[in-house]
Amino acid sequence: MMKIYEGTIISCDRENHVNRYLVEDKGRILYVGDELPAAYQGAPREVLGERTLLPCFGDTHLHFMSYALFNAGLDVRSARSLPELCEQIQKFTRENNDKIIMGFGASTHCVAEKRLISKDELDRACPDRAVFIVKYDGHACIVNSRMIAMLPDKVKTLRGWHADTGEMNQEAFFATADFITKKVSLPRTIRNMLRAVDDMAEKGFGMMHTVSGVGFPLDLDVAMEMILGKGLDSGFQSRVFFQTMNLDKIRKKKLPRVGGCFATALDGCFGSEDAALRQPYANNPQNRGILFHSNEEVIHFTKQANREGLQIEMHAIGDAAFNQAVMAIEAALEDCPREDHRHGIIHACLPSEEGLQKCAELGIQIPLQPAFLMWNLEPLEFLYSILGDRAERISPLRKMTDMGIVLSGGSDAPCTLPDPIAGIYAACNHYIPEQSLTIPEALKLFTFNAAWTTFDEKERGSLETGKMADMVILNRNPLTMKPNELLGLKVEHLLLKGEPYKKGQGMLSLLAKGLLPGGRI
């Protein structure tokens, strides 16, 4: 049924139009403008009042399978001491029969002891079951003795293996995560995924770009996320990036894009002090972090993927990794020029000046995570302690935008929770004030730019005639608010294809639809 929305309509289009009327019918936008044509006058009308209508939000980088798993499990981010963390583990263990206790969010910065929990402490908290606690940044974990006993011998030979403390970094962490994800049952996985989509919808998301490929047998996680993308009956959109440098896997899945973190991560992260830097860490002159791949390996991958017409995204946190990503994409485009490739560098937390110039010249886009700028699990004081004055160059949003680089907003969930309002707030309140974005620019990170990033802007991302009526109603008008007030925004309704989002899709319904041919993912 046709419906009219009257009030503040923020289009988030290229010209930042704000209109008075929007007419929706059968899931599409028929009209947007300031005068309501006579042909639509008789349709039912919703007067927004102080509320505002915008495009639904998109999250351009999250580890959806991991987010779904930990979203339904043990979250230790609220612990303020190690005894409290142990109590949380014990409580969860009493209430759940899981053979492996999986948790997320350990941080040295939020507990009084200012260190990670140890293997011995995990042993005392949970002596009878294996425990696997992922660090807040998603790049390390702590395990107990029972978990160590379960791991295959090949994991114990990898870089980052520390049996004495139970902390696993670099390749040892990735291999441990691969091993554990194989233990999660398929029905539980599907239930967790459906619940996670419902939780994202509550925050106003109607699209996500998920990076997949974390060690499930036969890449089952990728297959399941593809089924999810096709099987959701609400109209929620999912675009899958397969984290692999093995393009045979991409061909078999017939995906138009490749990359993410894990196998396509070029370095580590600041929290583990293994993000690859051009100059040593301020607190350790012997440490410049780690590049996981040689230049030759990355160039071979990007050239091959670019020749096949794939969209490429790679994780790079430090400036050395950022430069490696730029160099490899430039080499690929010199080898096989493409006008509208939309290759991207995920995070780009500490970009170099020359690398940004290349991004602007080559059309390299950056899916970044504004919430990192106000992350209590990785506070600014810590970043200054390891980077010195370089901390002031993290995520220079204003500079990148003024250079013409397309930025989009994501969460890197489960590292931060999917929350577009928090991301918009952070982008407008950078701790270096001159690097903040305007409110319209910040809104676009999670709307138009999010859709553009995966070639979806012709159908989604802005409220324009002919596009899908994927929309959110906010309680207030962000354009009349001050940047420091933006956390007062609340999502009241998510509308996909013009209809209110409905929670609780069943497993059988998802599989029945998701296994059919067709559908865009």
Regions found by a protein language model. Give the residues of each.
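Active-site microenvironment of metallo-dependent hydrolases
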Residues: 1-37, 86-96, 182, 186-202, ...
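Divalent metal-binding segments
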Residues: 3-5, 10-25, 29-234, 240-245, ...
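An anion/phosphate-binding loop that grips the pyrophosphate of nucleotide cofactors and donors
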Residues: 60, 362, 469
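Non-cysteine beta-strand/loop elements that form the S-adenosyl-L-methionine
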Residues: 63, 258-274, 364-374
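Flexible loop/turn segments at secondary-structure boundaries
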Residues: 109-111, 140-141, 208-209, 215-222, ...
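Extended hydrophobic/aromatic segments used for targeting, binding, or gating
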Residues: 222-256, 260-261, 351-361
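His/Asp/Glu-enriched, well-ordered alpha-helical/loop segment
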Residues: 303-312, 320-323, 327-343, 348, ...
